Amino acid sequence: MSNFDQEFDASGLNCPLPILRAKKALTAMASGQVLHVIATDPGSVKDFDSFAKQTGNALLESTEEGGKYHFLIKKG
């Protein structure tokens, strides 16, 4: 996993909560900073891809490990 500035664990939360919490966290971050999100909802894979495209942020990494999905989102 690459370097990141902030992390939050959305394990156990279902759509749309991981996206809403990521949006809130990114709002408080500076442009160029990276947020690491951990989720367990399989739907979060396509959700975070769409979210990044719609909001002008960059999805740097999307991986699955042991039933947990890890996303690195760079604030645009």
Task: Indicate where each model-derived feature is located.
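C-terminal structural segments of small proteins and small subunits
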Residues: 49-76
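Intrinsic-disorder/low-complexity, polar/charged segments enriched in Ser/Thr/Lys/Arg/Asp/Glu/Gln
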Residues: 5, 32-36, 68-70
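Generic beta-structure capping elements
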Residues: 11-13, 40, 74-76
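Amphipathic, hydrophobic secondary-structure cores in small proteins
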Residues: 16-58
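Short amphipathic
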Residues: 4-11
